[in-house]
C-alpha cells in the first residue's frame, strides 16, 4: 500500500514535471534530477587556486548561522564531509557558524597539535572564511564604507583572521594552535567603489608608519609571512589565498579585479542564479573578467537566499526564515543548481543547508549534491533560458534583493581621442574602458569618424585598467569627430559622446 508521503512525493514530481514541460524542458534535461545519492562527487579545478573542488560546497549560513531549535548544525558539517564535499565556507559575519565548524573539526580530528590530528584530511579540504573589515590599520571612521564584523568593535582585518582561527581551531577566546591556517580569506561583500579604494590602500607600497593601511596589504603579509606593513611582527603565515565576494554590483567587482596589478586576488565568490539577467547581471560582466584572470570562481545565492521559495526577498533575520524543504511543488531545486554550475567560468557553488535527513529524498544536502553532478557545459543555452522562464515569475522577478536593478547595455566608458605625429604622419588614437553588458553579452566595439564607421574591435573581458584602443592614420589636416559604439549579441547598440579632434 502506498503511504501518504509517497503520494506527496509523486504529486510533487508530477507538478515539477508539468512545470518543466511548460517551459520546454523534460526531466531528462537535467543530470541527477531524480537521483539522491552520489558515489564520488565531481570536482573542478579552481583556476590558480590549484585545488579540485567538489561542484557543491557547504555554505556557512542557513542553519549553520540561523540555527533552528531542533537542528544540530554540527551534524550538517559532518554529513558534508561524509558525502565527500571538500569546499567549506564561513565568515566573521555569520554568528555562530565558525564556532559550529570548530565543534565539527574536533570530532574530525582537524585540530593541529592535538592527539590524532588528521593532517591528510585537513589538506584534502578547502576552508574559506571572510572579513568585512576594510582596514588593517586606521580608517575605521572613514565615511562611505561597509565595515563590519561580529568581533569586537574597532577590530581590524587581521583581528578577524585570528578570530576565525580561534573559533574553528582554538579556544574561541583568541588563542589558536600553531599550524592552524585558512585556505582562503575573502574580503566580504564589496558594494561600493570607496570600499575598493580602502582595501587597496598601501598595497605594493606598504609603509609601517602610514596612518591607514588597507586590508589587502596586511593579508599579503599574513599569506607570505612578511612584515611589510609592520602588522605581522611574528612573521606568521595564517592563510594561503586571498579573494573577495560580491553580490551587489558587477561594476564594483570588475573594478576590484582590474586594479589588481600585483596578482593578489586568487578567487571571487559571486551571486549567480537563474534570475541574474533580470538584474545588473554578473554572468556577462564580472564573471568573464574573473575567468580571464584564471581566478577561482565560487557561486552563491542559487536560491536567492531562500527567496526562490518561502523566504521574503530580504536578508535572513532569524531561524524562521531558513528554508528547510527541498524545492517546492512548482519549482524544483535541481535545475536551479545546474543553472548556476553551467554558467561559464563557475567552478563550484556554495549552498547553505537548512535541513538534513536520513531519507536522501528529503535531505537538502544530498539532493543539492546530486544536482551538482553536471559538467560545465551540461546545459544548452535553450535549457538555461527555459530555467529562467521558470524562475522569472517568483516574487515577480524580484528575488535578488541583494543585486542592483537591471540596466541596459551602456556606452563604452571614459572614451577619449588624441592625435600625435608619428613618422611624419598624423595618427589619431581612440581609447575607452569596457561597456557594461545588459541582458545579452557584449560582442564588439565600432569606431566611427564623422558619422562613418571606420573599424571595429572585438570585445574581450577587460582584466586591467589598460583601455581598449583603436588607431588610424589620417591623411588630411582637418577637424574630425569620433565616437565608439558598444554592440551586444542581439545587435543592440550604445554610443559614446562625440570626441572632437582639432585641426592639425
Please state what every model-predicted region is.
Residues 2-126:
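N-terminal binding-site loop/beta-alpha segment at the start of enzyme catalytic domains
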Residues 489-504:
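Extracellular fibronectin type III
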Residues 46, 58, 88, 127, ...:
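Conserved, mostly hydrophobic/aromatic
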Residues 444-477, 490:
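Recognizes extended acidic, P/S/T-rich segments that occur
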Residues 141, 146-274, 291-298:
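Glycine/proline-rich, positively charged
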Residues 261-264, 285-425, 431-437, 441-443:
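Structured C-terminal cap/extension of enzyme domains
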Amino acid at each position: 500500500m502506498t503511504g501518504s508521503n509517497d503520494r506527496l512525493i509523486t504529486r510533487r514530481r508530477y507538478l515539477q514535471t508539468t512545470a518543466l514541460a511548460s517551459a520546454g524542458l523534460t526531466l531528462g534535461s537535467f543530470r541527477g534530477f531524480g537521483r539522491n545519492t552520489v558515489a564520488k562527487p565531481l570536482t573542478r579545478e579552481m583556476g590558480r587556486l590549484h585545488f579540485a573542488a567538489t561542484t557543491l560546497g557547504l555554505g556557512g549560513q542557513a542553519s549553520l548561522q540561523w540555527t533552528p531549535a531542533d537542528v544540530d548544525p554540527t551534524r550538517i558539517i559532518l554529513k558534508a564531509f561524509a558525502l565527500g564535499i571538500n569546499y567549506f565556507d564561513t565568515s566573521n559575519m555569520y554568528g555562530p557558524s565558525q564556532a559550529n565548524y570548530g565543534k565539527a573539526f574536533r570530532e574530525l580530528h582537524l585540530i593541529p597539535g592535538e592527539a590524532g590530528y588528521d593532517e591528510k584530511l585537513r589538506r584534502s579540504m578547502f576552508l574559506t572564511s571572510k572579513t568585512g573589515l576594510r582596514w588593517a590599520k586606521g580608517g575605521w571612521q572613514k565615511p562611505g564604507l561597509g565595515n563590519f564584523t561580529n568581533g569586537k568593535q574597532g577590530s581590524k582585518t587581521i583581528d578577524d583572521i585570528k578570530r576565525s582561527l580561534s573559533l574553528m581551531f582554538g579556544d574561541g577566546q583568541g588563542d589558536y594552535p600553531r599550524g592552524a591556517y585558512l585556505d582562503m580569506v575573502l574580503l566580504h561583500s564589496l558594494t561600493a567603489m570607496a570600499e575598493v579604494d580602502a582595501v587597496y590602500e598601501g598595497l605594493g607600497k606598504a609603509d609601517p608608519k602610514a596612518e591607514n593601511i588597507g586590508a589587502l596589504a596586511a593579508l599579503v603579509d599574513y599569506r607570505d609571512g612578511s612584515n611589510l606593513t609592520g602588522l605581522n611582527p611574528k612573521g606568521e603565515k595564517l592563510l594561503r589565498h586571498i579573494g573577495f565576494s560580491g553580490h551587489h554590483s558587477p561594476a564594483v567587482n570588475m573594478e576590484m579585479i582590474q586594479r589588481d596589478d600585483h596578482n593578489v586576488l586568487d578567487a571571487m565568490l559571486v551571486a549567480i542564479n537563474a534570475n541574474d539577467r533580470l538584474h545588473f547581471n554578473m554572468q556577462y560582466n564580472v564573471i568573464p573578467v574573473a575567468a580571464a584572470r584564471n581566478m577561482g570562481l565560487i557561486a552563491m545565492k542559487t536560491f536567492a537566499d531562500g527567496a526562490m521559495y518561502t523566504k521574503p526577498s530580504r536578508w535572513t533575520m532569524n531561524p524562521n526564515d531558513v528554508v528547510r524543504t527541498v524545492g517546492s511543488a512548482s519549482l524544483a531545486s535541481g535545475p536551479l543548481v545546474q543553472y548556476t554550475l553551467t554558467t561559464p567560468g563557475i567552478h563550484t557553488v556554495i549552498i547553505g543547508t537548512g535541513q538534513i535527513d536520513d531519507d536522501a529524498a528529503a535531505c537538502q544536502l544530498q539532493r543539492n549534491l546530486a544536482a551538482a553532478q553536471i559538467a560545465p557545459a551540461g546545459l544548452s543555452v535553450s535549457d538555461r533560458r527555459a530555467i529562467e522562464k521558470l524562475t522569472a515569475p517568483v516574487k515577480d522577478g524580484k528575488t535578488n534583493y541583494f543585486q542592483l536593478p537591471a540596466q541596459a547595455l551602456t556606452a563604452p566608458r571614459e572614451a577619449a581621442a588624441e592625435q600625435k605625429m608619428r613618422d611624419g604622419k598624423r595618427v589619431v588614437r581612440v581609447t575607452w574602458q569596457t561597456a557594461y553588458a545588459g541582458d545579452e553579452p557584449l560582442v564588439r566595439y565600432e569606431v566611427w569618424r564623422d558619422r562613418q564607421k571606420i573599424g571595429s574591435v572585438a570585445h574581450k573581458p577587460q582584466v586591467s585598467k589598460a583601455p581598449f584602443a583603436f588607431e588610424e592614420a589620417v591623411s588630411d589636416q582637418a577637424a574630425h569627430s569620433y565616437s565608439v559604439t558598444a554592440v551586444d549579441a542581439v545587435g543592440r547598440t550604445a554610443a559614446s559622446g562625440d570626441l572632437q579632434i582639432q585641426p592639425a
